[in-house]
Amino acid sequence: MAGRVEGKVAFITGAARGQGRSHAVRLAEEGADIIAVDVCRRISSNEDIPASTPEDLAETVELVKGLNRRIVAEEVDVRDYDALKAVVDSGVEQLGGLDIVVANAGIGNGGATLDKTSEADWDDMIGVNLSGVWKTVKAAVPHLISGGNGGSIILTSSVGGLKAYPHTGHYIAAKHGVVGLMRTFAVELGQHSIRVNSVHPTNVNTPLFMNEGTMKLFRPDLENPGPDDMAVVAQMMHVLPVGWVEPRDISNAVLFLASDEARYVTGLPMTVDAGSMLK
């Protein structure tokens, strides 16, 4: 039985670990070949979040190859349009086309109110989480159009792209901006049968969330909070009785939006949020 994206090629940013790796593996499980990029070094000033590494990206490569799918992987900063374009061009040449784009790369740092956020933190956040998304799509669109078969673009936003939380205003601004990109690209690219949607996760069990800084942000009342301490507060964000979801939960949404099952779905901000938006 053919996979749900059998024979397609997907370009995924932030693919070394976390949600990006999960997306690469899930799409490969369903028959896609992968173009994967990740910066593989620290960008955020938040030292509580361990940086992705070349070894992480190499592990993603091996996982995809283990599914008998092809993968082209490079270390690329999504703020560097020329580098993005080069790897997409090369990947398309090697793999034979492009059908799916998952603009997933992102960073997180928080703790300060907006008026006390440093310019460096603001610039990094907007550069990666908003401008990087735009540059990713910009690099990929010519291949989707020239392929003549339409395509699916999925942008990773957040529930923070639909509502606000304190102490992460630069993140909130970037993720709201992603929704604007999604809607505009959907309007502009629809004539080419290219669909554009966004996914809006709540807390996800990845290093971006499961780190000392986030735990202290959730539990400032404790000196050394752990995951169980954070879960007590995190669960209060949701209607369903969980503190966070797993990367594969987001990947299943990405797979649906990438597949022909969603052939007439475009301009949709899809939440995977355990009911967070109902709170």
Swiss-Prot record:
The active site is at Y171. The keyword Hydrolase does not apply. Its EC number is 1.1.1.-. It holds the Pfam family adh_short_C2. SUPFAM superfamilies: NAD(P)-binding Rossmann-fold domains. NAD(+) binds at residues 11-33. There is a cross-link at K65 (Isoglutamyl lysine isopeptide (Lys-Gln) (interchain with Q-Cter in protein Pup)). CDD domains: SDR_c. Keywords: Isopeptide bond, NAD, Oxidoreductase, Ubl conjugation. InterPro entries: NAD(P)-bd_dom_sf (IPR036291), SDR_fam (IPR002347), SDR_subfam_1 (IPR023985). NCBIfam families: PRK12826.1-3 (NF009467), SDR_subfam_1 (TIGR03971). Belongs to the short-chain dehydrogenases/reductases (SDR) family. This is Putative short-chain type dehydrogenase/reductase MSMEG_6031/MSMEI_5872.
